[in-house]
Amino acid sequence: MQTLIGVCWGIILTSPCRRFGGGGKIDPENPKIISVYDALKPKLGENFTLGYERGCDWSATNETAIIREGDPRTERLNMMLMESSDPTNWKAAIKLASESDVVIAALGENPTLCGEARQRKGIRLPGDQERFLKELIATGKPVVLMMFGGRPQVIDEVEAGCAAILQAWYPGEEGGNAVADILLGNVNPSGKLCVSYPKTESEELYCYNNGVSQEKIAYPFGFGLSYTSFEYSGMNVPATAQTTDDFIEISCRVKNTGMREGVEIVQLYLSPESSQSLKPIQLKGFARVNLKP
């Protein structure tokens, strides 16, 4: 049986050096730079067919704005935002998705939308990307959302419709291979979020020294899924400790309860006795452990 994988939208096909490298300067002709699309093709078996359509673009040209009026950089910025190496074809992308067994939607921001001196009026998926993603989901096919960019983005209206979500950030020179290996299950993901994801645009990302909000968030700091599961038990914490000690020893047991080998990031958080502290909860330590079932 032939399985068709539909790749919709173009971050992963065109000019990966700018999409994957953030604001850094790298050589676009360097053969080591590979897109996710090009990384997927040789990794798929003969029973898989990979299709591609660029359904929508990054954003409208006015999505990013320079605050100071009359800034001469505005014209250059608009030209950067209008760059598109592939023409978009919304209908063709939706048609490909409806005919596919699995849909990979590569969305998010590029360095002209998120980077040094780049500002947007909101943090939802830019331009028409959210509407495009909703139409992909409406086909009824499993949609794997890959999000690129340098900050959290609000996805409250689409997350429930996605079969899986992979936050790829700006993955760098080998990002294409790394993301492809995770998508295909060649690598078991183990990363944890270094920021919290807001549920709506009305909430701001908080730092520990701003207290702990009672508002629900989409994904908390330290969150991350795996292709396996882990179980914690036997927490061992000393009843007393000297404040002059360089460290205290805290331990627990971690068991891989899933079906495949995986890495878990064990995180230790501490809270002061006073609830009025400016830092009510802090990450104080972590350990990376590789476990077999």
Predicted regions and their residues:
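Secreted, periplasmic, or luminal enzymes acting at the cell surface/secretory milieu
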Residues: 1-21, 27-37, 41-47, 51-81, ...
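Beta-strand-rich interaction surfaces with strong enrichment in secreted/lumenal proteins
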Residues: 285-292
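Short, flexible loop segments at the rims of nucleotide/cofactor-binding pockets, characterized by
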Residues: 79-85, 121-123
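Extended, hydrophobic alpha-helical segments in both membrane/secreted and soluble proteins
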Residues: 128-133, 143-145, 165, 179
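Glycine/threonine-rich flexible loop motifs
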Residues: 18-19, 109-126
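An anion/phosphate-binding loop that grips the pyrophosphate of nucleotide cofactors and donors
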Residues: 100
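Hydrophobic anchor at the start of a short beta-strand
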Residues: 50, 141-144
